């Protein structure tokens, strides 16, 4: 479940890394949000999306690197914001080190879970936009909806799991969500 720990103090990334092994959390503006383990449907969608993105990048000989959670993103290059997007695509490889990504990924995909709904649609939308993420997709299997925000062009696409969704950071890449829906029996 994604909820802040009640504390008047603010936390830092040091507190995140001090959590017991296996506990996942994100840090937004100094507040810790614990994360529930993802369900099978969530993981199936994440796997299908990652595989499609990774295959595309490799087929084009691209220099961008896709990552799936848990992967550390130090969003504002400070110690008050740490997220683990379901999928991150980083094209500036200078942002990468052994701990993760220092700064905004180019493309972020979040797959909505019941416990992450408010975070994905509101807090993360704002944080990703202001941090410099170029493109943000919110994939919501419960609502059969994909919102694709292209922050560079100020476009928002609203799709279903029967549509193909074009990636804004690539000219010739789209993901067929109907194929993913078939895997999920949607």
Walk through the language-model features, giving the residues of each.
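Gly/Pro/Ser/Thr-rich low-complexity, intrinsically disordered segments predominantly at protein N-termini
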Residues: 1-186
């Amino acid at each position: 479940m994604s909820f802040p720990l009640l504390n008047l103090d603010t936390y830092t990334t040091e507190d995140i890394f001090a959590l017991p092994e296996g506990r996942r959390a994100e840090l937004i503006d100094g507040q810790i949000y614990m994360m529930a383990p993802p369900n099978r449907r969530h993981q199936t969608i994440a796997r299908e999306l990652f595989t499609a993105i990774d295959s595309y990048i490799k087929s084009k000989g691209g220099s961008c690197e896709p990552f799936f959670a848990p992967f550390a993103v130090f969003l504002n290059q400070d110690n008050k914001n740490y997220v683990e997007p379901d999928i991150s695509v980083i094209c500036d490889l200078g942002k990468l080190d052994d701990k993760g990504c220092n700064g905004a990924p180019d493309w972020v995909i979040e797959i909505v879970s019941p416990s992450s709904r408010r975070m994905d649609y509101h807090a993360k939308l704002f944080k990703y936009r202001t941090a410099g993420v170029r493109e943000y997709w919110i994939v919501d299997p419960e609502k059969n909806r994909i919102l694709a925000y292209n922050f560079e062009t100020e476009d928002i696409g609203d799709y279903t799991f029967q549509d193909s969704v074009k990636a804004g950071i690539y000219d010739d890449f789209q993901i067929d969500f109907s194929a993913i829906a078939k895997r999920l029996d949607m």
